[in-house]
């Protein structure tokens, strides 16, 4: 379509103040967001006779309208720009795809505080330690904390309703503050303080405190207690000796980038309280013909300005590249943090060594990603050749999971040229069908998925159905009956039947519900891609089915007991801390739950035991 945007008329009325601009295509979709110190000067650069960037040329051809928002300062413009990028996800902007909040270790503010993994806005009262690069690092640290400092990690509902210590106490991983007489409040508070000091990086103070207590116990002839504290000191020392301690006191993020013109890897190394907390590699979505300067400028802005409320900002940010808006960016991040944050680009000494480490890891991560992308690209090309298709932008796959027809769940997974799009995975609880009728289940999920308006970008090129001719026939019937405003004939429907022994490599592809299928060679890249998407769909369906089955299982055994309605079921599970705790409880313990008489407690006890 010919571009009808009147750039000359638009530029004649644009202000020269700082601000943010949004560019729209003919469909009204925001395709690019930018900021400028001088809006008129910046926007004029897009419409010059000679444009240096091929990306800019492609962008300008798509422009149908431009909106501008004037701001008081460049800092305001920067913050607004990244807010718009996050909201609209424009296709010509560099996008940070992994925008999950970082996990923290949370120490609650209860009388007997608990340790837990936490992700999200910090609304709950307590202390937060981190951020950690991933949930695995948090789980490993929590497991270590249990061995070093045995404070509780159980949910409050379990803690409030214990009448005797749990298994964690028996194996020395908890002091059992839930039951009176096992640990004093003072002793528990002391262990909590050790946790606080240890997670804050003050290992020496922890060891000094433990040594003092060990000596006091020894002098008082409490040799068993002294030996236990001695073992705790040894365990803490073993851990701290293995940790790499940096020669810095403040929090520091070290960032390097590796870029090959198509794929960018931004590697972030986190230092907290002078220790290497971990690292993380990011692969932002980079539009074609994007410069390295734009990649790093946009990444840093999105990384620190978006979601800053749930991220602990460092005192200093060390970069392996020059940043055009370094001063403005530092001011913006500092205003959010409420304290001065420095951005450095030319370090010396130890900091230069950390930057070299980040640079090496960025290059390694990029090389690994390139190999993965090459494999994915090879598989896509093989599949396109097999199906005689010019391009495949989007594929979806469906699977059904149930146990003897109960708690049926259907899954839909989505793949694009880069592999799985996990943010677009969906599960569907299936109801109103004959138990075990997989055809009816497939009919229902496909109707729910496609029997509505779809954006053009959401229409799949291929839909894989996990099943043979019957399931494929069901899918074809559904699509023939659809009454929708998009081209329902566009998706290619393919049935994927497992081999006789359900072994990988023996799959048969069906393109029609009648006739013979096609069996690909076991070393076919196209087959490997199909197996990948089919296995993902299967995994996603089974996980959803197990969750649904577990939810039903947790209440079904109570539903059959006369006199126990929904409110009493909820009350029992809440006060006892779950179904397993209720099963383990005595009649007397069950009778302590509000509204539960002794007679009803006996009935519940007998029903759960038998």
UniProtKB/Swiss-Prot annotation:
Q: Where in the cell is it found?
A: Cytoplasm
The molecular function terms of the Gene Ontology recorded here are: DNA binding; excinuclease ABC activity
Q: Which domain of life is it from?
A: Bacteria
Primary site of residence: cytoplasm
Q: Which Gene3D superfamilies does UniProt cross-reference here?
A: 5' to 3' exonuclease, C-terminal subdomain, GIY-YIG endonuclease, UVR domain, UvrC, RNAse H endonuclease domain
Name the CDD domains for this protein.
Answer: GIY-YIG_UvrC_Cho (cd10434)
Cross-referenced InterPro entries, in alphabetical order? Answer: GIY-YIG_endonuc (IPR000305), GIY-YIG_endonuc_sf (IPR035901), GIY-YIG_UvrC_Cho (IPR047296), Hlx-hairpin-Hlx_DNA-bd_motif (IPR003583), RuvA_2-like (IPR010994), UVR_dom (IPR001943), UVR_dom_sf (IPR036876), UvrABC_protein_C (IPR050066)
| Its biological purpose | The UvrABC repair system catalyzes the recognition and processing of DNA lesions. UvrC both incises the 5' and 3' sides of the lesion. The N-terminal half is responsible for the 3' incision and the C-terminal half is responsible for the 5' incision.
Q: What is this protein called?
A: UvrABC system protein C
Please report the organism this UniProt entry assigns to the protein: Proteus mirabilis (strain HI4320)
Annotated gene: uvrC
